């Protein structure tokens, strides 16, 4: 089963952040001059020939081969980031079922996911292996999901576990974009010298999905202001 948490389906507001105020310690952020930014998580290699002339594309490269990535570049995709989930396990990914004993709790509204203890060395090793595989495929960066595990489980071991994983990614020479993760990112930027994060993507800035009614809603002013201030 493919990943069903598809960003386009939920009509997320996607905000690519290259702000010096937020990421002042970064060198070069994701596609500093990117005008066409496309997120296609949930798609597979069947879309390869349908895409062209994109500055920054986010895909789940687990479903793409090295040749697919090369073909995307031939089609004019200038930067390619891969989705990677570091903070939860997903039942449709075969390797994640091996880590059930490290789960922390249910992931609200996503029954196929559970929060994972990112401080577990076994999980960190698994994530490193996934990172290596994505690097071999030729991606330019990582679109890192579920650092929000620190919001749900605000323990130093969880925070440090995220740092360990991001540090491994950073040493590959690829760029790192955090999806959401405001609680983690705010702490990181106030307590560390930023050498890891190149950008932030935030969902649900202006709208949100109401799971109970299966509909979309407009965020209230305070929510909009919180996210825009964060970004």
Walk through the language-model features, giving the residues of each.
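Bacterial N-terminal signal peptides that target proteins for export
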Residues: 3-13
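C-terminal motif of bacterial Sec signal peptides marking the signal peptidase cleavage site
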Residues: 24-25
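Glycan-processing catalytic domains of CAZymes
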Residues: 29-231
């Amino acid at each position: 089963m493919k990943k069903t948490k598809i960003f386009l389906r939920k009509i997320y507001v996607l905000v690519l952040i290259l702000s010096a105020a937020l990421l002042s310690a970064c060198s070069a952020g994701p596609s500093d001059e990117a005008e066409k930014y496309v997120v296609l998580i949930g798609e597979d290699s069947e879309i390869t020939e349908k895409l062209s002339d994109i500055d920054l594309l986010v895909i789940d490269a687990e479903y793409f081969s090295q040749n697919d990535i090369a073909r995307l570049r031939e089609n004019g995709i200038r930067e390619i980031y891969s989705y990677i989930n570091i903070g939860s396990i997903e039942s449709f990914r075969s390797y994640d079922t091996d880590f059930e004993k490290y789960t922390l709790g249910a992931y609200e509204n996503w029954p196929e996911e559970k929060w994972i203890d990112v401080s577990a060395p076994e999980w960190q090793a698994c994530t490193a292996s996934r990172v290596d595989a994505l690097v071999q495929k030729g991606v330019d960066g990582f679109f890192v999901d579920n650092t929000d595990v620190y919001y749900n489980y605000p323990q130093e071991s969880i925070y440090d576990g995220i740092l360990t994983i991001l540090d491994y990614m950073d040493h590959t020479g690829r760029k790192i974009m955090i999806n959401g993760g405001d609680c983690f990112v705010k702490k990181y930027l106030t307590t560390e010298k930023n050498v890891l994060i190149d950008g932030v993507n935030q969902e649900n800035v202006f709208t949100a999905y109401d799971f109970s009614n299966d509909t979309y809603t407009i965020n209230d002013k305070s929510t909009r202001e919180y996210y825009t201030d964060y970004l």
